[in-house]
């Protein structure tokens, strides 16, 4: 054995020192790069379409603009979590800051996690995705009816919302409410506030997003395994993926209670009990952090890329990231088993969002390229989450995500040709000039959006990714408006120009003339009973649009009009009562909830709301 010389020892020490210095510099360089990227995100919030020369916003300013108390962000880059950070406060009373360890309600972003858990049971040969789910259900069965004669509801149908499940949601509960069991929710029996879960479409006929689709999945997992849903999901998902700050328990431990965010309504008031209880845990019951959820996303990405064998197999994980079954032509996404899938010029993004009372969460991650982001807030302003996602996309150079355009001057001759009113189904759209700029707006909206020319024939709006084009009709030469798909440039909608003197019945409501509006709707109903604008559901949707925009007089008048047109429907009285409650008209709310119950004694939602109002008297 040769003894090292002094010279060799000196060379070795020098080499080790240089290696240490290189690693230190590399580490410092990576840290600096991360700090720069974080700053770009924090100051890069922008609109859905970015116009060159537009300024951007900071996270702090937009939180203040919307009135959002706290937000947690986790950014994924190169298949790993690049950073996670909190902003603002988790509770207005304690002023405790949001950190990366603060828990938020994941809301409907729970569904991909549940789907992952169900697929792990498939992997263990306890379930078959294409089997009739009633083969596994013991405590309850999907009701057999005319829609399940030919096709049975499968696990796969439920995971991607193609089962034809009704109703859409199952509701949430205050901490002092009587909380229903899962079987009571499935049967729609008191104290559950939802209608019974059933099917009203044939499986695979269409896709219809429904929280209620995941309630049979939860019951199936309970019946197959025998433990609580929280215990099952801990073993199948949370523990293997090291999601150590996550739980499906609706009663949090004292330690987690200290770190949970308090939910706030859009008016800034606190949700009673700091947040609602969600016994339908499979659809919206997960408590988690942005960082923990990012661990879930990176596992899916790494598994799909063959870089991880932790948790679910690659073959089954692929089912989460591939479109399954029919698609909904009105959606900008397709559905895998759990995730929504967005195709941006063949770049596939895994996406989901969720809204619980006082909480909003959204995730966006490239299926194949190892980048993404999770944004969670303790208030409900979806556009803020979208602005943060766009800031991350811009800072980290995501492929085909954020459209950027240069503004082109609009000729006077074009302005004169395209201004006017256009009609799409039940919607009237106005194109008008104001202050040397073009604007477009739905007549139900208060404000318009600037219409920006970006090429010889294409226009955009800052809040919509689709293109707009104006072209003359081949037969009569009349200018029509077209919505153009950004990916393949196909026409998605044709909006016909209409006479500016013809009024839509809803315009009388907007002008405050209730009697004229009622007469116009009655006339339309008599002349065209099948007209889509006269249906109970459409008018109800208009009422809720005003309701969510806090235009309460319009909301009340719309629901009132619907009651007069459809006096035998329990739903119209329920909606009017809800608006009365929000407007502080407690006596009217009680009266109309009672009327709704009189018409439908099984309206558990109305019964619960009525009890809440009567308690407060």
Regions found by a protein language model. Name each.
Residues 62-72, 94-157, 198-212, 281-284, ...:
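Short active-site loop at a secondary-structure junction
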Residues 25-85, 170, 222-227, 231-235, ...:
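Catalytic loop of the DD-peptidase/beta-lactamase superfamily, centered on the K-T-G motif
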Residues 56, 105-109, 121-170, 219, ...:
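Active-site helix/loop module of the DD-peptidase/beta-lactamase fold
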Residues 51-55, 135, 174-202, 227-246, ...:
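Short, charged, amphipathic alpha-helices and their helix-cap/turn boundaries
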């Amino acid at each position: 054995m040769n003894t090292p010389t002094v010279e060799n020892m000196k060379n070795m020490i020098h080499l080790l020192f240089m290696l240490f210095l290189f690693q230190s510099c590399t580490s410092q360089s990576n840290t600096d790069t991360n700090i720069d990227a974080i700053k770009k995100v924090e100051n890069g919030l922008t609109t859905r379409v970015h116009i060159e020369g537009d300024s951007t916003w900071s996270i702090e300013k937009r939180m203040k603009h919307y009135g959002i108390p706290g937000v947690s962000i986790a950014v994924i880059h190169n298949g790993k979590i690049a950073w996670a950070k909190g902003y603002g406060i988790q509770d207005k009373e304690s002023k405790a800051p949001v950190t990366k360890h603060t828990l938020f309600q994941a809301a409907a972003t729970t569904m991909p996690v549940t789907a992952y858990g169900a697929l792990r049971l498939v992997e263990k040969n306890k379930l078959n995705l294409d089997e009739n789910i009633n083969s596994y259900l013991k405590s309850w069965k999907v009701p057999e009816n005319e829609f399940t004669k030919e096709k049975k509801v499968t696990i796969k149908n439920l995971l991607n919302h193609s089962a034809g499940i009704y109703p859409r949601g199952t509701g949430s509960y205050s901490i002092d409410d009587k909380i229903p069991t899962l079987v009571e929710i499935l049967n729609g029996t008191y104290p559950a506030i939802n209608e019974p879960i059933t099917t009203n479409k044939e499986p695979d006929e269409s896709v219809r997003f429904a929280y209620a689709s995941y309630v049979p999945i939860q019951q199936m997992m309970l019946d197959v395994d025998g433990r609580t849903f929280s215990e099952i999901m801990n073993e199948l998902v949370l523990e293997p993926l090291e999601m150590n700050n996550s739980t499906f328990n609706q009663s949090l431990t004292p330690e987690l209670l200290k770190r949970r965010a308090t939910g706030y309504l859009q008016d800034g008031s606190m949700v009673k009990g700091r947040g609602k209880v969600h016994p339908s845990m499979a659809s919206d019951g997960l408590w988690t952090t942005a960082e923990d959820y990012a661990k879930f996303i990176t596992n899916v990405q790494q598994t799909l890329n063959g870089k991880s064998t932790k948790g679910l197999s690659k073959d089954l994980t692929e089912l989460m990231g591939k479109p399954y079954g029919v698609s909904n032509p009105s959606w900008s996404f397709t559905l895998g088993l759990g995730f929504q899938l967005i195709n941006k010029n063949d770049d596939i993004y895994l996406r989901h969002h969720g809204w619980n009372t006082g909480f909003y969460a959204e995730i966006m991650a490239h299926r194949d390229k190892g980048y993404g982001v999770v944004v969670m807030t303790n208030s409900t302003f979806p556009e803020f989450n979208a602005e943060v996602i766009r800031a991350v996309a811009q800072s980290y150079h995501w492929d085909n995500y954020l459209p950027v355009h240069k503004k082109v001057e609009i000729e006077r001759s074009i302005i004169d040709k395209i201004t006017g009113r256009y009609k799409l189904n039940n919607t009237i759209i106005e194109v008008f000039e104001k202050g040397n700029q073009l604007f477009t707006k739905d007549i139900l909206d208060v404000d318009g959006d600037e219409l920006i020319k970006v090429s010889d024939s294409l226009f955009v709006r800052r809040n919509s990714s689709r293109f707009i084009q104006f072209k003359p009709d081949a037969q009569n030469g009349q200018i029509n408006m077209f919505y153009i798909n950004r990916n393949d440039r196909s026409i998605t909608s044709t909006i016909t120009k209409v006479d500016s003197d013809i009024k839509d019945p809803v315009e009388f409501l907007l002008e405050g003339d209730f009697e004229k509006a009622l007469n116009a709707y009655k006339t339309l109903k008599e002349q065209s009973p099948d007209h889509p604008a006269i249906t109970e559901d459409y008018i109800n949707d208009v009422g809720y649009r005003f309701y969510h925009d806090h235009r309460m007089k319009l909301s009340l008048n719309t629901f009132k009009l619907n009651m007069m047109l459809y006096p035998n429907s329990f739903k119209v009285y329920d909606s009017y009562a809800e608006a009365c409650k929000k407007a502080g008209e407690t006596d009217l709310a009680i009266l109309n909830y009672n009327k709704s119950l009189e018409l439908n004694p099984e309206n558990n939602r109305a019964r619960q709301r009525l009890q809440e109002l009567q308690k407060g008297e």
